[in-house]
Amino acid sequence: MTDLSDIRREYTQGGLRRADLPKNPMQLFELWMTQARDAQLSDPTAMCVATVDEHGQPFQRIVLLKRFDDSGFVFFTNLGSRKALQIAANNKVSLHFPWHPIERQVSILGEAQPLSTAEVLKYFMTRPKESQIAAWVSQQSSKLSARQVLEGKFFEMKAKFAKGDVPLPSFWGGYLVKPSSIEFWQGGEHRLHDRFLYTREAQAWQIDRLAP
């Protein structure tokens, strides 16, 4: 077994105090996202999306956040993917943003609701044409005999859609994750990290400090 117990660092970039917390967690998330972008983090919108299968086995993957507001967090995916099939059976998910360079994490629990076709199409039309074509090519999570199979299909579809717009695939969609709780974690000195949990209660949010 490889021993990694000596890998550690101190957290020095500041704390998080209750007096600084807004009543609405989405305001704090917006501030932290802005600061993550300003810090030029690699892929600040990358989040881990966790789902479970029918046996209770959890699965995680990195997905890009595409939009957020007071209603929740939006991402897009192939509707034949493992994540989409698992969401169809159990729409309870968790999201996690690991902003290690600025010593912050955000963890979200909620329910994923499918977006309307109009909402999906609006976003799909903003994607680069090659990305639109790629959505047609990949049967996400299916087994491939070789990468060349995928590349061959890509160039085939690229030729097919050389002229005009690329239509929205019927098997491509998106989700709005409506949060029931949002936890903000800020690294602290001596491992005395600051953790605050927002829990939705009716029309307001309960705020609790958690032990690190």
Swiss-Prot record:
Any Pfam family the entry gives: PNP_phzG_C
Gene that this sequence comes from: pdxH
Cofactor binding, note field: Binds 1 FMN per subunit.
Organism: Shewanella oneidensis (strain ATCC 700550 / JCM 31522 / CIP 106686 / LMG 19005 / NCIMB 14063 / MR-1)
Cystine connections: none
Assembly description: Homodimer.
GO molecular function, one term: pyridoxamine phosphate oxidase activity
Catalytic activity: pyridoxamine 5'-phosphate + O2 + H2O = pyridoxal 5'-phosphate + H2O2 + NH4(+); pyridoxine 5'-phosphate + O2 = pyridoxal 5'-phosphate + H2O2
Keyword DNA damage recorded: no
Name assigned to this protein: Pyridoxine/pyridoxamine 5'-phosphate oxidase
GO biological process, one term: pyridoxine biosynthetic process
Family as reported in the entry's similarity comment: Belongs to the pyridoxamine 5'-phosphate oxidase family.
